[in-house]
């Protein structure tokens, strides 16, 4: 019988095994690194977002904020509080009211942290003097620390005071900004504007300043377009469910009295003006957006205006996101 002398082949076997294990490890490392860099690249592609909101006015702001929370395509840098001094319910400091609401609302979401910053309680006095606040400084700071090729998306759900003030304080940040504003009425066929609208009236000087800012990337979700996004109360309350976040939104719907209209006294329906701009940024395929000339009383330049939204799909998208969100929120046992 012939025997194989393994002592002769053993070194070669070790070399082969070593090469095999090295190759295997290299492949494993490659997979790990590929997944890491893919995740990092995906994370880097998120939009850097600040929401500027008059959340103590109305209820639609809170639905808009809800849609933005933990949105995978957003890097939510902060929520700044805006003033709404023209409301008949206005206190001496409506920005502070909004700030307190923001703290209450975000506090309902366990393990979720986002900077909450107080903005100016007053509108601009003129188009040259900013209303310096923590919010305007926060906007400036966030714009400055972003890499040159990255944009800061400022979503204005109320008055334009904080954003306009930031630009007045630091005009060099203009090229870093994409400003999305919910405001004024717009006739898309005639390209005529009606600035007699709540958000616009709360700081008409600031609104005009943004319209007059040459080179500023300004995108408008007009009241004309956003009014198409309407939620039904019974459907909304059923979908909100019994949880801290849903109960807060239901209470807000029930208790807030709409001073601007005598229609639908029972509040069976609510226009989600502000949710429309969040939905549009997340799902641009659900919108039409076109380029228009600014109003005749403003600097002659081009801005972008949303002319239509798919309100049904936008609402469906909200509820899909909401259900995912509340799955991470413990139900109130009481």
Predicted region positions:
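Short linear sequence motifs
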Residues: 2-3, 13, 23, 27-30, ...
